[in-house]
Amino acid sequence: MAAVTEHTETLHEQPLFWRSAQGADPPVLYLHGVPTSSADWVPFLERTGGLAPDLPGFGRTGKRGDNDYTMAGYDRFVEAFLDHLEIERVRLVAHDWGVVGLLWAQRFPERVERLVLVNAVPLLPGYRWHPVARLWRMPAVGEVAMGFATRAALRRTLPQPLFDDAWRHFDQGTQRAILRLYRSSPEDALARAGLDLGAIECPAMVVWGDSDRYIHSRFAEAYADALGGQAELLHLPDAGHWPWYDRPDVIDRITAFLVD
């Protein structure tokens, strides 16, 4: 397995943290979701190599109050991160809110060689936010709800291997980023954000833990239908929102697709 290296540099006058490992060319770009960090992707980096940044507001990347914690802001971050490292093409893997990478991919489909979506927030018509997200989207109520995000509550939510890192970085800056992201993302905006998914014509794989309490498995088919190229579907009935922790064997399935 490849050794995973941690990096901290400065981008836009604030810390930028990412993990990397030697591997495939073009590299795999792994984008994490809420409320975790690039730590999600260590088992993949060890197998495929690649890059996994902490998105702004999460992990060890900057959490300034004046950051743009919107879909458009994260889209610009992905572009800036790749430009900073002078990377032209990638194999893209996105989980949950890592789906912001699809905004970048729709603008630059020629820069994406392969695509894997794993229980990704639907940039599609018909999605309705889950109950916790609806609370977060409400002014004042969301702040109160964050107050109930205790150590015990987060432990019940996350796969055990991710808990320590997520809790260590689940500070006021991360909570602010989460609230701003959800509040700037009404359901109709999600659907509009995916209007050009058909422009992404590279080979794709859509992986779904069907026991996800946040996103219904029907959106796996919806994503496969919306993408412009051939998309392989993999449903995992016995897995949840982070399916590779419930079914570690899926890591090898995704790895084989990425490096084929």
PLM regions with names:
Residues 126, 146-198:
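Conserved alpha/beta-hydrolase catalytic His-Asp/Glu region
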Residues 239-248:
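Catalytic histidine-centered segment of alpha/beta-hydrolase-like enzymes
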Residues 38-43, 60-63, 102, 125-126, ...:
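Short N-terminal helix/helix-N-cap motif within the alpha/beta-hydrolase-1
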Residues 52-93, 97:
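Active-site loop/oxyanion-hole signature of alpha/beta-hydrolase fold enzymes
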Residues 12-20:
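A short loop-to-beta-strand scaffold at the N-terminal edge of the catalytic core in hydrolase folds
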Residues 20-60:
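Conserved HGGG/HGGXW glycine-rich cap/lid loop of the alpha/beta-hydrolase fold
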Residues 106, 114-143:
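Flexible "cap/lid" loop of the alpha/beta hydrolase fold
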Residues 174-225, 235:
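Conserved serine/cysteine hydrolase catalytic core
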